[in-house]
Amino acid sequence: MNCRLYLPPGYEEGKEHYPVIYVNGEIPMEGIMTVLVNKGVRADFLLLSVKPKSWNDDFTPWTAPAFRAEEEAPQGRADAYLSCLAEEIKPYMDAHYRTKPEPVHTALFGYSLGGLTAVYALYKTDAFGVAASLSGSLWFDGFCAFMEREKPLRTDLRIYLSLGKKESRSKNPRMNRVAACTERAEEILAAQLGETGGKVFFEWNEGGHFHDIEGRFVKAIMWWMAVE
């Protein structure tokens, strides 16, 4: 896996410790930071994007039929990916950078299958106290049923879900269930967190799955900064 790190302004000269956003997959980092700067937002956090060896394999929790006829079936290696992230990459970051290592200051973001894995992580590791699933592939075969059977490992979670209003128009009969599945995931998480102090926020965006990805990340980051 390849990683790319963003450091906040003044990091090299200071002694302050910072919260960290880990991102499942590559993101348009320069564009996101430019939008934040243009909004007058000071990005006082570390951000590490993690490129997987295989998007479809590393960001699926179990095997499933191929998403499209021309693709191979996903191999369901998210457990191994999350183990590496939580047990190797995060400890390295905490040891070599001035992070705030506590889960409350540690977020996991992801888009599409990366967003699916951000939610899945809540049931597999307690390393992350915040998760953001942007246009997450929560339609994935059996995922809502998995959420209903299992429980998150933390009860103080803060969770952000977002979805484009046109995403359910997909011609793919599995993917066009995404709106119903995301709404169901929100219900499940809200019920599981109950009165424990955890919170779930769901935001609708304009457009389809690939519309304004930078803007959707900016919205999620600004939500996180407000609750951090």
Identify what each model region corresponds to:
Residues M1-P19:
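A domain-start/cap signature at the N-terminus of enzymes
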Residues P19, N24-G25, S135, L163:
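The conserved beta1-alpha1 loop
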Residues V20-C84, E88, Y92-R98:
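Serine-hydrolase catalytic machinery in alpha/beta-hydrolase-like enzymes
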Residues V50-P52, G136, G207:
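Active-site loop/turn elements of alpha/beta-hydrolase fold enzymes
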Residues R98-Y111, A131:
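Alpha/beta-hydrolase fold nucleophile elbow
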Residues G115-K124:
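Short glycine-enriched nucleophile-adjacent loop
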Residues L138-D212, K219, W224:
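The feature captures the conserved acid-bearing segment of alpha/beta-hydrolase catalytic domains
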